[in-house]
């Protein structure tokens, strides 16, 4: 992947980690496991056209990387940020496959997004972009197939906009997006969950050294 430095780095790090295990099992080589893991199942790349509040038409690139669904439907967030490109999303989808497998839940790995930068955009502009993004993608996601969520630049508001557009187009709404707002059926305290998880993890690590969290600062 010479033109995809982020993806190349992610793949190299994982392969270095599993090299000894891989070399000890001839079945991995016979099944061409490495190449199958490194090449995503599907890559969707598309133009997203949207209109700003002044009536000017803009074009951004949209993507969805369906990396691997060996153990379940594709699952991974959607990122809106000016730095988004194919290499970054392939890297994120690749790692998402492994992260999801560690949960022991039947979920594959995916990632999507656009180089659209929501910073400085009005609520109406963000809504129109979210709707335009899903207009191009909706046929390739859905329950049992690919369940997106939020990521950088995509919170509950943006997920709600995309979820609403998907419902309108697909006329179906079960199990399509996670990370929705409570008013759209989202999970309670989901925004806090990652932060709480970090604290619980830190507490367990401190216990191994008989250290208390109280009074500690960074």
Q: For each predicted feature, which ranges?
A:
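Short, mixed-charge aromatic SLiMs
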Residues: 188, 217-218
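Short helix-loop-beta connector
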Residues: 211-216
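N-terminal ligand-binding/catalytic initiation module
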Residues: 1-193, 199-201, 205-208
